[in-house]
């Protein structure tokens, strides 16, 4: 009984602080818009806020593997909206989102303020994105994150990765670093991190706020060179994500002709803190 009451009080307190953090997010977003990207990096604002949100939610990030430095295309398996907080807090990258989000109330305002790139679903939808993204990368701007599976999963497997967005790395000559996220069950043994199926955002946020805390592993995979066809690059990046998660490699699709190993991509790297 006492534990239930204390748990309810903790959830209520977290909810109030989370609402305050949301108000702070809009304040930061407005500041970024007023200052402009040359005075304040939008990705810095998202990272600053995400680190505080993770602390409030009781989410601890454990990092494993060599973290490369410099501009990169970061690709990652997709489990939850929490992924965005984890990656923004760890890397301060730009993100790619579906074009509908641009016009969503509140969320669209935040996404636009932190320099999100947008992609339209369907045939030819990636062309406008690539037109904007490739020169941006060639100009030496920051890294960006792609979730090439195209949807969220329960985290137990990795879906085939769509190769079309890998064209940005190939065209700009930017290396690809695979990332792998694994959420551990909470202290009550529940897998609450996956945001899948008919789940609603409000209900999921409620479960996360009520949880005693989560641990997420962020694994940095081996850097992949852009000097290979995008289909091959996508398959190799997916294979590296699967390796980081302890999963067997998926057989190469018929469109992928894997010959000799790809040439190594070796910019400076630093060990990720555990």
Residue ranges, per PLM feature:
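Polar-ligand-bearing catalytic/cofactor-coordination segments
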Residues: 118-120, 221-227, 240-243, 273-274
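A transmembrane-helix-recognition feature enriched in membrane-embedded lipid enzymes
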Residues: 1-62, 109-113, 211
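A cross-family acyltransferase "interaction/gating" segment
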Residues: 106-108, 156-235, 247-259
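Soluble extracytoplasmic domains of inner/organellar membrane proteins
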Residues: 133-166
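Cytosolic-facing loops and C-terminal tails of multi-pass membrane proteins
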Residues: 236-274
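Catalytic core of membrane glycerolipid acyltransferases/transacylases, capturing the structured
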Residues: 25-41, 54-56, 70-124
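A membrane-cytosol interface segment of integral membrane proteins
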Residues: 116-143
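Residue-level preference for the first positions of well-ordered beta-strands
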Residues: 71-73, 141-147, 175, 217
């Amino acid at each position: 009984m006492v534990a239930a009451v204390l748990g309810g009080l903790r959830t209520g307190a977290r909810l109030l602080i989370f609402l305050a953090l949301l108000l702070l997010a809009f304040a930061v977003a407005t500041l970024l818009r007023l200052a402009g990207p040359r005075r304040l990096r939008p990705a810095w604002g998202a990272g600053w806020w995400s680190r505080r949100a993770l602390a409030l939610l009781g989410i601890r990030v454990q990092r494993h593997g060599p973290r490369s430095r410099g501009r990169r295309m970061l690709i990652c398996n997709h489990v939850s909206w929490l992924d965005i907080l984890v990656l923004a807090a760890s890397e301060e990258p730009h993100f790619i989102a579906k074009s509908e989000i641009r016009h969503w109330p509140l969320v669209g305002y935040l996404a636009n303020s932190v320099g999100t790139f947008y992609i339209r679903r369907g045939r030819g939808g990636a062309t406008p994105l690539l037109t904007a993204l490739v020169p941006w990368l060639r100009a030496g701007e920051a890294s960006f994150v792609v979730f090439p599976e195209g949807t969220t999963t329960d985290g137990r497997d990795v879906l085939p990765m769509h190769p079309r967005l890998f064209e940005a790395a190939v065209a700009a000559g930017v290396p690809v670093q695979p990332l792998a996220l694994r959420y551990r069950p909470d202290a009550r043994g529940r897998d609450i991190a996956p945001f899948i199926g008919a789940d609603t955002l409000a209900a999921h946020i409620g479960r996360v706020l009520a949880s005693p805390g989560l641990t997420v592993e962020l694994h940095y995979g081996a850097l992949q060179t852009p000097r290979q066809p995008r289909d091959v690059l996508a398959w190799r990046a997916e294979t590296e994500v699967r390796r980081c998660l302890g999963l067997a490699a998926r057989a190469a699709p018929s469109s992928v002709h894997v010959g000799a190993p790809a040439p190594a991509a070796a910019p400076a790297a630093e060990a990720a803190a555990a």
